[in-house]
Amino acid sequence: QQTGIDAATVSEKPVVASHSGAHALSGHPRCKKDEVIRAIVDKGGTVGVCCISAFLGGSGDINAFLDHIDYIADKFGTESVTIGTDRAYVPPRDAEERRKIPRRGASRIRFEGFWQPDDPLKDPKWRDERMQQSLAWTNWPLLTVGMVQRGYSDDDIQKILGGNILRVAREVFPDIP
């Protein structure tokens, strides 16, 4: 958490916590505490809420995802939150299909190997099919529906769905069209 505060403080440009969430809602180490979010927001940056059930906590589904958006937007403003998926769509038969492809060389360590042994990510309950599918990219239009249902304006929805990250990218990389 302190590294996030330090990075935002010393940066001359806005920073992004791209694949995160609100620590107040889940307590996962990948999520940012309010002090970190404040440092990022004060610098003009944004926090990207990820689509990983174990990081989101709560119901671990699209509602938990929207809860993180609500928390950050309510506490820090709609300019402070964006989508930071941290995952691609994985079809239900992915593992079966991957077994058909011969392995070449040594396997790399999966990112989960870097987390503490008691990390929620390792708990099988977060691999529930309902949770996974509700956060699948095929359901991303439902993020918009959910934000409409929760009372966000069209302008705020556009910011959250990509406007905020584009704003930061344009400020950080002004010479790129």
Predicted regions and their residues:
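Conserved, mostly hydrophobic/aromatic
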Residues: 19, 40, 47, 86, ...
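Mid-to-C-terminal alpha-helical segments outside catalytic/metal-binding sites
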Residues: 124-177
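Short, electropositive alpha-helical surface patch
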Residues: 8-18, 65-74, 100-110, 144, ...
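Short acidic/histidine-rich active-site segments
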Residues: 51, 76-100, 106-133
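Short glycine/threonine-rich loop-to-helix capping motif typified by GTGT followed
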Residues: 61, 92-98, 169-177
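Histidine/acidic residue-rich metal-binding segments in metalloenzymes
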Residues: 1-16, 29-45, 63-79
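Active-site beta-loop-alpha junctions enriched in small/polar residues
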Residues: 1-2, 20-23, 52-54, 86-90
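Acidic-and-aromatic substrate-binding clefts and catalytic sites of carbohydrate-active enzymes
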Residues: 22-31, 55-63
